[in-house]
């Protein structure tokens, strides 16, 4: 089992200084690197003080310039909010300047509130279709010239500039909590991120059973790595009386 860190710039309201929020967040990423964590993950969310992450690739660029070894992951880039040419190029540029440390996570998006602002008219429950169109397009753009005429995006012959350092592309992770997405990830050779967060661990066990069913149904594909996010409390003392409560989302990779 390996451990990863998923952390956001967070505050309850604008009474807390953003410089302090940023300092604390970077300190935690640097501590994770020194502690042997394998990946630091940045989210994408919009207009939420509790998850300040308007562009995960910008956040990871910042972390890349202040770390040396830890790998850097998007958890996740929300497909419906991006154009494929834009996302392919930005992700590849991060892979370049980080020395090939990108772990590319893509997903459907979590909150209807955000879709109402970022993609009006799109139901969160339908956004998986954008993700499933987007991912194959990204792979083709990273590989070379490609023209696309799809349900959600169309563009003439284009390519990713630059190309990723990692060949044929960075490791790809798909956010999955349903059988249709587990199936898609397995068939496309992707690793998997699941978010039980703080719910009973039975939810993680349910996701694992769905993943196992997908693996069994699609023989001949590589077995994906599965990372599970759990909110984890970290203390600086074994004495419960002196606990300073701090909860961080931590991924366990199995």
How would you name each of these model-derived features?
Residues 244-250:
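Conserved small/polar residues in nucleotide/adenosyl-binding loops
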Residues 230-239:
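Short, conserved secondary-structure transition motifs
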Residues 3-7, 40-42, 72-74, 102-106, ...:
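Hydrophobic faces of well-ordered beta-strands that scaffold small-molecule active sites
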Residues 25-29, 57-61, 88-92, 132-139, ...:
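Generic structural signal for well-ordered alpha-helices
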Residues 1-18, 80-148, 192-194, 198-202:
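Flexible, glycine-rich active-site loops centered on histidine and acidic residues
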Residues 60-68, 95-101, 186-187, 218-221:
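Acidic (Asp/Glu)-rich catalytic clusters
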Residues 63, 94, 138, 172, ...:
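Conserved, mostly hydrophobic/aromatic
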Residues 1-72, 167-170:
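N-terminal beta1-alpha1-beta2 module of alpha/beta enzyme domains
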């Amino acid at each position: 089992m390996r451990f990863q860190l998923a952390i956001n710039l967070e505050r309850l309201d604008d009474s807390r200084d953003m410089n302090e929020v940023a300092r604390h967040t970077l300190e935690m990423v640097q501590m994770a690197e020194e502690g042997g964590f394998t990946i630091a993950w940045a989210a994408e969310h919009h207009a939420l003080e509790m998850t300040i992450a308007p562009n995960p690739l910008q956040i990871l660029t910042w972390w890349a310039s202040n770390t040396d070894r830890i790998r850097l992951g998007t958890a996740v880039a929300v497909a419906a909010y991006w154009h494929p040419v834009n996302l392919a190029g930005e992700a590849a540029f991060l892979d370049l300047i980080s020395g090939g440390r990108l772990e590319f996570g893509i997903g459907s998006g979590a909150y209807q509130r955000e879709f109402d602002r970022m993609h009006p008219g799109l139901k969160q429950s339908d956004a998986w279709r954008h993700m499933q169109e987007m991912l194959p397009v990204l792979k083709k753009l990273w590989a070379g010239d490609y023209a696309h005429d799809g349900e959600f995006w169309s563009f003439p012959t284009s390519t990713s500039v630059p190309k990723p350092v990692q060949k044929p592309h960075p490791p790809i992770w798909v956010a999955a909590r349903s059988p249709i997405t587990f199936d898609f990830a397995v068939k496309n050779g992707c690793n998997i991120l699941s978010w039980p967060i703080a719910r009973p661990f039975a939810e993680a066990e349910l996701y694992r059973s769905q993943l196992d069913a997908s693996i069994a149904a699609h023989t001949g594909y590589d077995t994906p790595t599965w990372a599970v996010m759990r909110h984890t409390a970290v203390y600086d003392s074994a004495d419960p009386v002196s606990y300073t409560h701090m909860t961080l989302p931590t991924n366990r990779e199995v």
